[in-house]
């Protein structure tokens, strides 16, 4: 092959290399976490809809690539935060309070999430008539990972966990079944679990004998890895994440509404939690 043909072909290859569109790298990827602590249902069921929500957020914010994770367990959430260093998150109240200072969380908005739980806590029982009937007795719960949250925020001063003989459970329905089977006199549950009562075999007669005050909704937060500009743009996009064509996706995840907010929404519970 002649030299005058080799040179143009080599030059063409070089130009193609130089003009290739940039590929997304790990550094370009914006990570988000959706952490609904002790949420009813499995992560696998929710993940595909969370992926669609994150894709909407990516499009609205002009991110090259976005990835997210739906979790219901604190250890899994903490592992994801450590490994992926997410920029943003939808986080239940208890972990928000626990992480607020250590992870330098900034509240950007709130999400009203159906069946997420955590808006109100109950003591339920078949035999006790009130809180006094649960004290000193076996009380089952899957909400014992953060005793400070229960003692300082949920109870409103009515009790501490030390007042009960605790039976720790892992799954929301398992907690209620402890009462049904007589393995516990009472169970400390949240509003999502109470809503499930009619659908659990043998739950007839299990009722709320004490309830907490209403608590703030799921916090939409920025982690320390998000820049000021990214925070401002993401906050401005929140109102559109569940509107129009995106509403169907939010309905699947159980998100009723998303709106911008700030830390003042959580001022009272922050004070009660004590940090």
Ranges and model annotations:
Residues 71, 76-133, 145-147:
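Acidic, polar ligand-binding/catalytic clefts
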Residues 27-97:
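Extracytoplasmic small-molecule ligand-binding "clamshell" domains
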Residues 35-60, 94, 117-177, 181, ...:
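Bilobed "Venus flytrap"/periplasmic-binding protein-like clamshell domains
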Residues 8-18:
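Bacterial N-terminal signal peptides
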Residues 19-26:
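Sec/Tat signal peptide C-region and signal peptidase I cleavage site
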Residues 29-39, 113-123, 201-242, 248-275:
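Periplasmic-binding protein-like
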Residues 90-102, 180-208:
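A ligand-binding cleft/hinge motif common to bilobed small-molecule-binding domains
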Residues 67-79, 165-177, 214-216:
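Short helix-initiation/N-cap motifs at beta->coil->alpha
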